[in-house]
From Swiss-Prot:
Function: Catalyzes the deamination of dCTP to dUTP.
Catalyzed reactions per annotation: dCTP + H2O + H(+) = dUTP + NH4(+)
EC numbers on record: 3.5.4.13
Metabolic or biological pathway, per its Swiss-Prot or TrEMBL entry: Pyrimidine metabolism; dUMP biosynthesis; dUMP from dCTP (dUTP route): step 1/2
Entries under InterPro entries matching the protein: dCTP_deaminase, dUTPase-like_sf, dUTPase_trimeric
Name of the protein in question: dCTP deaminase
Length: 193
């Protein structure tokens, strides 16, 4: 069962679900909560590594990632990040989210942005029970023109689905939780698999 607007507000009021900063009522829709773009980005720089062998030993993967991933790019309030056609960039939500052990979250990009070619999450749109942190966005520009992105703009929406019970292995209790308490545009940690 997906939570509707008044259930989302009740869960926020009761602090079962937390979104910081708390969204104003105008950003809580029938079954979703609007989320905004944060200030941090990461991009892929140059091509010092000819490829990334995802089945290679962890050290090789980590070395390749170090060669191609930029440092954090932090924008000020009015600054604009330009995502060019065919480019992939990581960004982060302005909001930090804590999801209880009996709820799963889903991230969807905005239709208006998709119609301009912006993919907000390339594949990872599930937010596990027990998740805590900012949500990293995997932006891809599939359009024909560069897209200007500014901190604070509406970028997507979260919906929440009630599970049949408490998760036995929520994200915050997993030993292999690579992104728990995530802050900022964290790069891939595939080398931690």
């Amino acid at each position: 069962m997906r939570l509707c607007d008044h259930d989302i507000e009740r869960w926020l009021d009761e602090k079962k679900l937390t979104i910081t900063p708390r969204p104003p009522a105008k950003h809580i829709n029938g079954a979703t909560v609007d989320i905004r773009l944060g200030h941090e980005f990461r991009v892929f720089v140059g091509h010092k590594a000819p490829f990334i062998d995802l089945s290679a030993p962890k050290e090789e993967i980590n070395h390749a990632l170090d060669q191609i991933m930029s440092d954090k790019i932090v924008l000020k309030e009015k600054e604009c990040f330009f995502l060019h056609p065919g480019e992939l960039a990581l960004a982060v939500t302005l909001e930090s989210v804590t999801i209880p052990d009996d709820l799963v979250g889903w991230l969807d990009g905005r239709s208006s942005l998709a119609r301009l070619g912006l993919m907000v999450h390339v594949t990872a749109h599930r937010i596990d029970p027990g998740w805590r942190g900012q949500i990293v966005l995997e932006f891809y520009n599939s359009g024909k023109l560069p897209l200007g992105l500014r901190p604070g703009m509406l970028i997507g929406a979260l919906s929440f689905e009630l599970l049949s019970g408490q998760a036995k292995r929520p994200y915050h209790q997993r030993q292999d939780a690579k992104y728990h308490n995530q802050k900022g545009a964290v790069a891939s940690r595939i080398d931690k698999d």
